[in-house]
């Protein structure tokens, strides 16, 4: 099992996430299976602790390449692990179907979400996620889905493009870049490749550091728009908490401020009781807290991990535990 050559990078914050999630046998959901690194770490910990029997891990991904890689990596645990093709926004239906087919209740002991684009996807030019190398302007995480980054770039009105760059990329020059995109469409025709978009950004943003930041923001914004990432994240957070059994935990690893703010805000709403309007002086909360925060501040990767895997530098992990029912 060890020593398998893989083009997928090591999973971010694997020891930390596993130590906080795995506390007994049960149903574990990896909503972002990727190459299977986190799932393998969870299964290994279940086996090491004597909890593998009676446990099931369901890994979800919409990327066919990732599913193939994960299937090979998890082959030794095929009795206890299933790789499912799908969007993690449908985690409730997917887990209910698969767990039900095995006679298990779809109540999870642990849920892991490792958000954003994988290092492998960034490294493959044909996926079109990176401005670092030329490739088609695709950016679909599910290659069978409709609607690419090129489709948005070539058809969206200027105001819509500016909104996408600002909302999803927090790009301060969103209007300038959007105007340049629409002007270029008229003068030179549609965009087809990542380097065409990168060259356009370089033509209107000045200063090496500012250019690099704008490139990252614009490509991030298009990727989020293509895959509707924030809308899907909102859905999976809500459904995920419903799937957790009392005492079950959810760990979410985010890589940019938009994701982290959403996760932080949602977790805060669960861990904070609602005592109603100020001054009423209620003895019981209107709505008690539904979870407790396992992590106060987000868990960050250490210097050694960042040196091995630079992507881990921006990672933040937040963990909550669903509270016991109090009826």
Curated annotation (Swiss-Prot):
Catalytic activity: cytidine(1402) in 16S rRNA + S-adenosyl-L-methionine = N(4)-methylcytidine(1402) in 16S rRNA + S-adenosyl-L-homocysteine + H(+)
Pfam families, alphabetized: Methyltransf_5
Highest taxon in the source lineage: Bacteria
GO cellular component: cytoplasm
Binding positions for S-adenosyl-L-methionine per the UniProt entry: 36-38, 61, 88, 114, 121
InterPro entries the UniProt entry points to: RsmH (IPR002903), SAM-dep_MeTrfase_MraW_recog (IPR023397), SAM-dependent_MTases_sf (IPR029063)
Keywords: Cytoplasm, Methyltransferase, rRNA processing, S-adenosyl-L-methionine, Transferase
Paired cysteines (S-S): none
Subcellular location: Cytoplasm
GO biological process: rRNA base methylation
EC number per UniProt: 2.1.1.199
Enzyme class per UniProt: transferase
Gene3D superfamilies per the UniProt record, alphabetical: Putative methyltransferase TM0872, insert domain, Vaccinia Virus protein VP39
GO terms for MF: rRNA (cytosine-N4-)-methyltransferase activity
PANTHER family: 12S RRNA N4-METHYLCYTIDINE METHYLTRANSFERASE (PTHR11265:SF0), S-ADENOSYL-METHYLTRANSFERASE MRAW (PTHR11265)
Family: Belongs to the methyltransferase superfamily. RsmH family.
NCBIfam families referenced in this protein's UniProt entry, alphabetically: 16S rRNA (cytosine(1402)-N(4))-methyltransferase RsmH (TIGR00006)
Biological role: Specifically methylates the N4 position of cytidine in position 1402 (C1402) of 16S rRNA.
Name the UniProt record assigns to this protein: Ribosomal RNA small subunit methyltransferase H
């Amino acid at each position: 099992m060890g020593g398998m050559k893989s083009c997928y990078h090591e999973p971010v914050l694997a020891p930390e996430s596993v130590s906080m999630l795995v506390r007994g046998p049960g149903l574990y959901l990896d909503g972002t299976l990727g190459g299977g690194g986190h799932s393998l770490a969870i299964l290994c910990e279940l086996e090491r602790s004597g909890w593998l029997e009676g446990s099931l891990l369901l890994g979800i991904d919409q990327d066919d390449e990732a599913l193939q890689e994960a299937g090979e990596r998890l082959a030794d645990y095929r009795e206890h692990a299933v790789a499912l093709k799908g969007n993690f926004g449908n985690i409730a239906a997917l887990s209910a179907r698969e767990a039900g087919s095995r006679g298990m209740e779809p109540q999870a002991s642990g849920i892991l979400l490792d958000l954003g684009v994988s290092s492998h996807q960034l490294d493959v030019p044909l996926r079109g996620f990176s401005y670092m190398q030329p490739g088609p302007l695709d950016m679909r995480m599910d290659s069978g889905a409709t609607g690419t980054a090129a489709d948005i770039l070539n058809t969206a009105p200027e105001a819509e493009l500016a909104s996408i760059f600002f909302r999803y990329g927090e790009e301060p020059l969103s209007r300038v870049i959007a105007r340049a995109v629409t002007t270029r469409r008229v003068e030179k025709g549609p965009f087809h490749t990542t380097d065409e978009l990168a060259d356009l950004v370089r033509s209107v943003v000045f200063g090496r550091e500012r250019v690099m930041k704008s490139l990252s923001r614009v490509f991030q914004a298009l990727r989020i728009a293509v895959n509707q990432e924030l809308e899907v994240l909102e859905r999976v957070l809500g459904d995920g908490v419903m799937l957790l059994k009392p005492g079950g935990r959810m760990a979410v690893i985010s890589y940019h401020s938009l994701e982290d703010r959403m996760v932080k805000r949602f977790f805060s709403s669960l861990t904070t009781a609602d005592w109603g309007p100020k001054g009423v002086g209620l003895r019981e909360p209107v709505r008690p807290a539904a979870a407790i925060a396992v992590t106060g501040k987000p868990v960050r990767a250490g210097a050694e991990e960042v040196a091995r895997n630079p992507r881990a530098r921006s990672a933040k992990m937040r963990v909550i535990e669903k509270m016991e029912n109090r009826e």
